[in-house]
Regions:
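Primarily marks secretory-pathway-exposed extracellular/lumenal segments that are disulfide-
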Residues: 4-46, 329-334
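Disulfide-stabilized cysteine-rich extracellular repeat microdomains
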Residues: 29, 34-37, 41, 237, ...
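Sequence/structural signature of beta-propeller domains
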Residues: 46-329
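Conserved beta-strand positions that form and line the central face of beta-propeller blades
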Residues: 23, 28, 35, 42, ...
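Positively charged n-region of N-terminal signal peptides that target proteins for export
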Residues: 1-5, 69, 406-407
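Short, acidic, Ser/Thr-enriched surface-loop or helix-capping motifs
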Residues: 26, 33, 92, 366-367
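C-terminal outer-membrane/trafficking sorting elements
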Residues: 334-407
Length: 407
């Protein structure tokens, strides 16, 4: 790494701590500010449409009302919503049921969502269309029991909660802001995302992963999503979040969307980048109810439940990859390549790294020792760095330098 480059990197790291100019730091945003060092959450993006990859119709009658989706060790897990039994279904990547597990000691009032951390799977029994429920709960299951293929029954623990700011339980049905179908888990807390029928926003409530009695969920922040949120997914490696939802186009016809959230300050997920992806209509997708992410990736699965009205649309499974829409590179220095700024993704990465809007020589340096790890020409096919050790690196593409993290 040349002396000028090292000096530049040192200077910018110092400047980050002293001057920290705030602005939109995402090169993909309409209002990208190349001089900004600190992301202030102001980025906005052009309207983005994406066609999900169709995997299969979920042909089993057991999955017609599936709601919620989680990915554990390459297996998908799903549940059914209100009025159904207390079963969890394991699916393969084609959507076929490979295992049925009975959750003992719990009820299914209105199961709506699944999430997980490293030790437990959580079921959200918090569907509340009428706004009148006073028995909202989270069901907690030990993952080590669930993943024991020799058993078909696991014990569930029911944890009750209420919203700290709800005092009126009269509804009316589908016209209030205290429904919920989405949540995510970290090591020690759960974040619930409301389904606001009344104002089309989402409110985030925080509760711990374990408590006694009835816990009072604390409101922490809100965001205008322009629709109804039906599920959420979280990747603990990259801290990326996806919110699945739909908006009514009138006369009962609706289209689905996914909000991508990343590069936010811990605890305040709506103060970072927020990008909406339009994914299609109910006639193609069905009623989208489940989403999950692959580890360290903005790719994953979406599931839908059956629509039975004037027409019947079966439950379905889809795949997506939104890596091209998310820039996680920490920019050390950058210049435009023609009219477009370049960026690297994914970041953090496990193996292959891609560079958008760039062709030419790239150099990868160890951030600690400054030693050259890789040098070669980039020709749009991605570079495989799976053989290098985990750590922090500097990737130099032309005159642009990015800080990259290898997991």
């Amino acid at each position: 790494l040349g002396q000028k480059t090292i000096s530049l990197i040192i200077f910018i790291f110092i400047a980050k701590g002293i001057f920290s100019q705030a602005g939109c730091t995402d090169p993909l945003a309409v209002n990208f500010d190349a001089s900004a060092i600190e992301n202030d959450g102001s980025c906005f993006y052009e309207t983005t449409a994406y066609t999900l990859g169709f995997v299969s119709d979920l042909s089993s009658d057991l999955l017609s009302e599936n709601s919620g989706l989680s990915l554990i060790n390459e297996s998908l897990w799903t549940i059914n919503d209100s009025g159904n039994n207390t079963m969890i279904y394991e699916l393969d990547s084609s959507g076929n049921i490979t295992r049925e597990v009975f959750v003992q000691g719990v009820n299914n009032v209105d199961w709506e969502a699944l999430t997980q951390n490293s030790t437990h799977l959580f079921i959200g029994d918090f569907g509340n269309n009428a706004g009148s429920r006073q028995d909202l709960s989270i069901i907690k299951i030990n993952k080590s029991e669930l993943l024991n293929n020799s058993i078909d029954t696991v014990l569930g623990q029911t944890l009750f909660f209420k919203y700290g700011d709800q005092f009126d339980f009269s509804g009316p049905t589908n016209a209030h802001n205290y429904d919920c179908e989405a949540f995510i888990a970290t090591a020690d807390s759960l974040s619930l995302f409301s389904k606001n029928w009344q104002n089309q926003e989402v409110r985030k409530y925080t509760i711990p992963c374990q408590w006694e009695g009835e816990y009072v969920a604390t409101f922490s922040e809100s965001f205008n999503v322009g629709g109804l949120i039906t599920d959420a997914a979280f990747d603990p490696i990259s801290n990326q979040i996806a919110l699945l939802g739909y908006n009514d186009l009138g006369t009962g016809i609706y289209s689905s969307f996914i909000w991508l959230l990343w590069d936010y300050n811990s605890g305040n997920i709506f103060n970072g980048n927020k990008r909406r992806i339009e994914i299609g209509s109910m006639f193609t997708l069905g009623q989208t109810e489940g989403i999950c992410l692959r580890p360290s990736s903005m790719s994953g699965y979406v599931s839908s439940e059956q629509i039975s009205s004037v027409i019947t649309i079966p439950p379905r499974l889809f795949v997506f990859n939104f890596e091209e829409f998310v820039s996680n590179s920490t920019v050390i220095s950058q210049e435009a390549q023609g009219e477009a700024y370049i960026y690297c993704y994914p970041n953090p990465f496990h193996s292959r790294v891609y560079i958008r809007n760039f062709k030419g020589r790239i150099d990868l340096y160890d951030a600690l020792g400054g030693s050259l790890i890789y040098q070669g020409d980039y020709l749009n096919q991605g570079v495989d760095f799976s053989g290098i050790s985990s750590g922090v690196y500097f990737l130099k593409a032309g005159h642009s330098i990015f800080q990259m993290i290898k997991n």
